[in-house]
């Protein structure tokens, strides 16, 4: 009788405590294809933060920021965007250029280079499509629907591109704060 009671108390009080401690907020849940891509660049994959971007009443996309430490800033991170509606390639490229121009005034040759890079990085987007941007020190690698679509070492482009979502004075400070994990209690 005492053995059964002792075993019951262990199961009720001790084991759940262990599971609570091992279930951290920064574990990531992704499909296997995304995990395979991330495994090529990260030994550990910890969630810094996640956010949902909405414009008026449209649910545009969900974003996650991943690093090996679970902290940002980092020289190595992944930004994952899962789209919640369809977008044309042209509209995504145009809006991305608009966001980049809020950070820098481009001369004509610079703007043409940016357009070339963005046209290589983006495709027509369907609901639930996934875009992964990985900053790996001095280079960036972009995946669309598990296909590597762009690799660049253009540091200015890399920083401006990721700063659309990550800079302190972004267009949507609440979104950026959530993505950077600043809303954790």
Residues of each region from the PLM?
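Classical Sec-dependent N-terminal signal peptides that target proteins to the secretory pathway
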Residues: 2-24
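Terminal leader/tail segments of proteins
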Residues: 21-144, 148-185
């Amino acid at each position: 009788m005492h053995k059964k009671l002792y075993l019951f108390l262990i199961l009720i009080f001790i084991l759940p405590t262990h599971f609570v401690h091992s279930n951290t907020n920064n574990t990531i849940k992704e499909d296997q294809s995304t995990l395979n891509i991330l495994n090529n660049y990260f030994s550990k994959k910890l969630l810094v933060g996640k956010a949902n971007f909405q414009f008026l009443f449209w649910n545009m996309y969900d974003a996650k920021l991943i690093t090996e430490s679970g902290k940002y800033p980092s020289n190595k991170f992944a930004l994952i965007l899962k789209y919640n509606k369809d977008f044309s390639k042209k509209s995504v490229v145009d809006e991305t250029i608009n966001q980049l121009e809020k950070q820098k005034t481009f001369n004509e040759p610079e703007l043409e280079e940016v357009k070339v890079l963005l046209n290589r990085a983006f495709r027509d987007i369907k609901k639930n499509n996934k875009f992964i941007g990985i900053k790996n020190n001095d280079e960036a690698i972009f995946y669309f629907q598990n296909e590597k679509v762009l690799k660049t070492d253009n540091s200015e482009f890399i920083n401006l591109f990721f700063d659309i979502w990550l800079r302190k004075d972004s267009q949507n400070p609440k979104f950026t704060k959530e993505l950077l994990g600043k809303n954790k209690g």
